[in-house]
Amino acid sequence: MAAALPPAAATWDDRGMPRTVYSLLFSALLPSLAHCGETIPTQGYTVVRTYPHDTAAFTEGLFYLDGHLYESTGELGQSSVRKVDLDTGEVLQQANTPPPFYGEGIVAWKDRLIQLTWRNQRGFVYDLATLAPRTQFSYSGEGWALTSDDRQLYMSDGTASIRRLDPQSLKQIGSIKVTARGKPLDNLNELEWVKGELLANVWLTTRIARIDPVTGKVIAWIDLKALVPDPDTLTDPTNDVLNGIAYDAEHDRLFVTGKRWPKIYEIKLAQ
């Protein structure tokens, strides 16, 4: 075996720093520079059909189950969870959320409907069939939205982090840090699990982020600016924003709406 060569002498710049240090620093920055150069595509869509929506419903959560929509509404004294007829918009069942609780996102798990509240650090569990209250649970921070896959729940809290919850204990078991072009994506709101991805409304924008649940990266945007109602027809144009995603997996139907919007839109994403 040949003898090892001695280490090469370091070269120095005019400020006395070894050039090898610059090389190492540049190498460390390469992944970040690559992220900054990423382009996130915007995915097209077509509107398949529209359905009526209660213009008094300040939508905070939405999901589809067995032919019906389930919706949670916010604002103090007006918060509720409700079962809704998709075709007519009629409220079939409703459970009011008492003050001082401000209702937020909902999800179904087996025979339970689970609801978050905004800043009260308290959640409510209802019987899915009757919407009768069952129990309560607690969590840290704010509660914004819920969805699930077949193993766990996902919870947003207005930050760039999506919590993973055990569906039985409702305790946090992990988290996903969501990024767009390498930067944290804050204000994640309503969530929906669609074909192995997380879809998230970004609060106060017209965009939905398609998120890889493994890496946390935004892989595409869905911009629904064209669906926003005329501001003159809204109760509060500043706050009556896009919020609400529901998915009918059996028939591959995606529904979107907004707070106090007059319509729910069934959309088909472009391939």
Which role fits each region the language model picked out?
Residues 89-124, 133-139, 143:
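Blade-loop segments of beta-propeller domains
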Residues 71-75, 113-120, 153-159, 200-204, ...:
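Conserved beta-strand positions in repeat-built beta-propeller and related beta-rich domains
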Residues 85-89, 127-131, 167-170, 212-216, ...:
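Short loop/turn segments that connect beta-strands within beta-propeller blades
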Residues 47-52, 90-96, 132-137, 174-182, ...:
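A short beta-strand motif characteristic of beta-propeller blades
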Residues 55-66, 99-109, 139-150, 156, ...:
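Beta-rich, blade/repeat-based domains predominating
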Residues 123-181:
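Hydrophobic, well-structured mid-protein blocks that either form specific transmembrane helices
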Residues 38-55, 86-90:
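A short helix->beta-strand "capping" segment at the edge of beta-propeller domains
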Residues 48-80, 96, 100-107, 258-260:
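Beta-strand-rich domains and repeat architectures in extracellular enzymes and scaffolds
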